[in-house]
Amino acid sequence: MSDLKLAENNFWGNVANSGPISIFSYCASSILMTVTNKFVVNLKDFNMNFVMLFVQSFVCTLLLVILKTLGYAKFRPFNKTDAKNWFPISVLLVIMIYTSSKALQFLAVPIYTIFKNLTIILIAYGEVIYFGGKVTSMELSSFILMVLSSVVATWGDKQAMQAKSLVESDVTVPVVPFNVGYLWMFANCISSAAFVLIMRKRIKLTNFKDFDTMFYNNVLALPILLLFSFCIEDWSSTNLSTSFTANSFTAMIISGMASVGISYCSGWCVRVTSSTTYSMVGALNKLPIALSGLIFFDAPKNFLSIFSIFLGFLAGIVYAVAKQKKNQNPEK
C-alpha cells in the first residue's frame, strides 16, 4: 500500500516484500475478524451490538492515529469539508456493519459467508445501472452458482434445525421457526452494495486514498454508533456487566485491530503480488472463513451445508477469473 512506510532491507524488508506472507496475513486477518465478531454476538445475553461496533471503530481510529504518529501511515487531517462530503458514506457504513453483526448473531458463519456473495451480484448490476458497466456470461455463471449455493445453504440450515428440534422435543413432525437472521442478511447485502456503489462516487469527489477512507469512515461512525446505542440499547449497570466481560471486550479490541489489518494486508498483497493474485486470494479466502465456523462454532455439518460451502467457493473462483478476463479484454 502506497500510504505505508515499509522497510527496505534486512529481515523486515524481506517480510514486507514476501507474497506468501502477505497472502497468509490477509487470510488470517479476515478469519480473525469474523471469528471474534461471532464470538461476541453469540455470548449469552449479549445485546449491545452498537457499543461493540463503537469499540471496534474507536480501536481502529486509535490504531490509525498511532501509525500516523509513528510515520507508518499517511492520511488527511480531519476537516469539515471532507467530513460533510463523507458523512452519508459513514451512515451507510453504520447500517452495513450493524446489519452484518445482527446477521452473524443469528446465522452460522458458513451460511453468513455464503450469503455475503449475493452482495457481489447487487454491486455488479448496480454498476451496470449507475456506471454503464456490463455483466459477462462468465460473471453471470458465477452469479447463478452464488444463488444456488445460498439456496443449498438454506436447505442445509433447515435440515439441521429440524434434526435439532427432533432431539429436543418429542414431536414427530418438527416445527422450524423462521430464522430472522436471513432478513438481517438481506438488509446487509443491500446496504453493503449501496455503501460500495455510493462510496465509489464519493471517492472521485474527495480523491481519498485507502487510509483517508478508513479514517473518515471510522471517525464519523463513532458519534452515530453512540447515538443509536443510547437511543435503542439498555445502558443499565446490570446489562452492561452482562454484555461486557473481559473476554468480550478483548475480542472487540482484537476485531478492531483486525479491521486495520485487513485493509493493510489488502494493499500489501496487491503491491507484492498482483491484482490477479489478490482477487483469487479473495475468492479462495471464502473457504477458510466458512470452515472456521465449522471448527469454532456449532454450525450445521450435514451434507447440504458442506456442499453449499464448496459451491460458494467455486462461485468465488469463477467470479475472480471472470473479472480478470474482463479487465484483460476491456470493451473498446
Curated annotation (Swiss-Prot):
Q: What membrane topology does the annotation report for this chain?
A: Multi-pass membrane protein
Query: Which family does the record claim for this protein?
Result: Belongs to the TPT transporter family. SLC35D subfamily.
Q: Where in the cell is it found?
A: Golgi apparatus membrane; Cytoplasmic vesicle membrane; Endoplasmic reticulum membrane
Its protein name is: GDP-mannose transporter 1
NCBIfam families of this UniProt entry?
Answer: nst (TIGR00803)
| GO MF, one example | GDP-mannose transmembrane transporter activity
Instruction: Report which superkingdom the organism of origin falls in.
Output: Eukaryota
Please verify whether the record's keywords include Endoplasmic reticulum. Answer: yes
Keywords recorded for this protein, A-Z: Cytoplasmic vesicle, Endoplasmic reticulum, Glycoprotein, Golgi apparatus, Membrane, Sugar transport, Transmembrane, Transmembrane helix, Transport
**Residues listed as glycosylation sites in the UniProt record:** 239
Source organism (scientific name): Vanderwaltozyma polyspora (strain ATCC 22028 / DSM 70294 / BCRC 21397 / CBS 2163 / NBRC 10782 / NRRL Y-8283 / UCD 57-17) (Kluyveromyces polysporus)
UniProt topological domain (Lumenal) ranges? 36-49, 108-110, 157-177, 234-248, 298-301
Role description: Involved in the import of GDP-mannose from the cytoplasm into the Golgi lumen.
Q: Name one GO cellular component term.
A: Golgi membrane
Q: How does it assemble?
A: Homooligomer.
Query: What stretches pass through the bilayer?
Result: 15-35, 50-70, 85-107, 111-133, 140-156, 178-198, 213-233, 249-269, 277-297, 302-322
Topological domain, Cytoplasmic: which ranges? 1-14, 71-84, 134-139, 199-212, 270-276, 323-332
